[in-house]
């Protein structure tokens, strides 16, 4: 039975199951949660989502992200990076600002990559920023969180050129083919991030994941975006990870407990949390 609590949908099966989940991509520090961040985190913990990876965006939200993480050490693990859609004419200043935080404890370089969906105006700058940040990750022996919206081929070509760096990481919100996944496996220790899109009708990733080993999958929400069914249309949050896990279990014919255990173990291994 599903019931409403404080205006949010809760499922007591998840809350009482003692299964542990990791949300490997949450922007719970986003202004969409202003004044509610701590409550949203508590809902996540109550649902078994005890650890959240916070990918960085840019200087506009970075300080808020670290402040939130500092209040909840052990639950929140912040990262550092310049999001490709934040790369514009002043991108070098943004990069310099980001490097001021390099003495902070971080668990990955990200969210980084190339975005060809919104604009290609600064595509060359996106490519250069990606290379710089891949080198930063290699130097610090950190995983990377890759944003690849309509740019997977470009990023794979970059990874081939940077193979000597020994990179590892996750392709966030993976929407590629099985063939692309197999190509990634030849380039290093790469996982795919599966989120709310998996629950949508006609989502192509639902077919692809059937042939991808569970040992290569980690779960994510991309909160406050990409809300899973049955909550699509409202703000996403980390407490919804179990619904993504449930759908993955249904599609792959796997027990929910196995999905929870394996994806959580994968996240612990990749991010060293």
Please annotate each region the language model reported.
Residues 2-273:
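Mid-domain alpha/beta scaffold segments of enzyme catalytic cores
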């Amino acid at each position: 039975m599903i019931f409403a609590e404080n205006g949010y949908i809760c499922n007591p099966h998840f809350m009482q199951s003692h299964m542990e989940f990791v949300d490997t991509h949450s922007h719970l520090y986003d202004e969409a949660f202003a004044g509610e961040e701590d409550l949203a985190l508590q809902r996540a913990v109550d649902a078994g989502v005890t650890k959240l990876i916070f990918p960085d965006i840019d200087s506009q939200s970075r300080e808020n992200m670290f402040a939130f993480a500092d209040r909840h050490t052990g639950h929140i693990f912040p990262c550092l990076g310049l999001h490709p859609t934040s790369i514009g004419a002043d991108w070098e200043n943004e990069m310099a600002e980001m490097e001021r935080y390099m003495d902070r404890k971080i668990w990955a370089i990200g969210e980084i990559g190339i975005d060809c969906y919104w604009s290609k105006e600064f595509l060359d700058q996106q490519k250069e920023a990606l290379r710089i940040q891949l080198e930063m990750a290699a130097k610090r022996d950190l995983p990377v969180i890759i944003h690849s919206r309509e740019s997977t081929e470009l990023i794979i070509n970059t990874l081939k050129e940077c193979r000597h760096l020994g990179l590892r990481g996750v392709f966030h919100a993976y929407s590629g083919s099985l063939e692309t996944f197999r190509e990634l496996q030849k380039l290093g220790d790469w996982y795919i991030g599966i989120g709310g899109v998996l629950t949508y009708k006609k989502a192509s990733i639902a077919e692809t994941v059937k042939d991808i080993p569970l040992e290569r999958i980690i779960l994510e929400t991309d909160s406050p975006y990409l809300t899973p069914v049955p909550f699509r249309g409202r703000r996403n949050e980390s407490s919804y990870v179990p619904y993504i896990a449930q759908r993955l279990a249904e599609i792959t014919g796997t027990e929910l407990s196995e999905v929870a255990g394996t994806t959580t173990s994968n996240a612990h291994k990749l991010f060293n949390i």
